[in-house]
Amino acid sequence: MSATNQSWRMLLPHDGMIGMSPQVGRVSVPMAGITHLRTSDGRRCPALRGVWSEAGRSLYVLLVPYDVRVSRMMQDVNRGDVIEFVGMSGERRDAGGDTHYAVVVHDMNVVRTNASRMENGN
């Protein structure tokens, strides 16, 4: 749990869809583990893959931590958890025409689900 003001959570929708602003949302984590992206200047950047449900469809989104605090929180995420976040979103299209979504996460909250509790033996 973050020690910062989490008044942004009031904007979270209860049906799993995007909130009042594209920077606030909720994603589920189907697979645990941090992946690393390589930036254009050669640095490695940690990221977590989540599933964003919106308008009856599911989209994969990469969650990229804004700072070390958020990065540490992401390392504790288990398969089946739900992440509520606030951040800056963006999308890009690759050469094949596929659209990729990413969010630079400024603050987040991890909601443990029954599946993640059972995986950890709790």
Question: Where would I find each of the regions flagged by the language model?
Answer:
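OB-fold and OB-like single-stranded nucleic-acid-recognition modules
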Residues: 1-122
